[in-house]
């Protein structure tokens, strides 16, 4: 599936995109509120400024994904792979990041404490 098809199906009311492969997808400023991307492959995807509040990204592969200024309020990112991801200025209020993994290359906003969110450093 590509970004265009995802957005078209989302606009038609579909919300369940479990395990979809959207590696390197360009979803800048996409409106995907409440979308289910459980186990999705979003490696290298550009989700900058995306509206993902309430989204289910449990177990998603977000390696090297750009989530700069994305709205992830209330999103589920449990066990997500955030190695090398960019989350600068991302809104994470109420997001569940427990068990999500990150590394020294993962970029968070200043003052964000991954340990307080029960994240795992790998």
PLM region descriptions:
Residues 2-122:
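Tandem repeat scaffolds
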């Amino acid at each position: 599936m590509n970004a265009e098809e995802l957005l078209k199906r989302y606009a038609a009311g579909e919300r369940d995109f479990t395990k979809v492969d959207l590696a390197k997808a360009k979803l800048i400023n996409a409106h995907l509120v409440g979308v289910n991307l459980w186990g999705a492959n979003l490696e290298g995807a550009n989700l900058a400024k995306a509206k993902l509040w309430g989204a289910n990204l449990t177990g998603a592969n977000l390696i090297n994904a750009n989530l700069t200024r994305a709205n992830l309020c209330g999103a589920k990112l449990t066990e997500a792979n955030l190695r090398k991801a960019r989350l600068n200025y991302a809104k994470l209020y109420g997001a569940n990041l427990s068990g999500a993994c990150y590394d020294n290359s993962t970029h968070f906003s200043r003052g964000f404490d991954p340990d307080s969110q029960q994240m795992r450093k790998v």
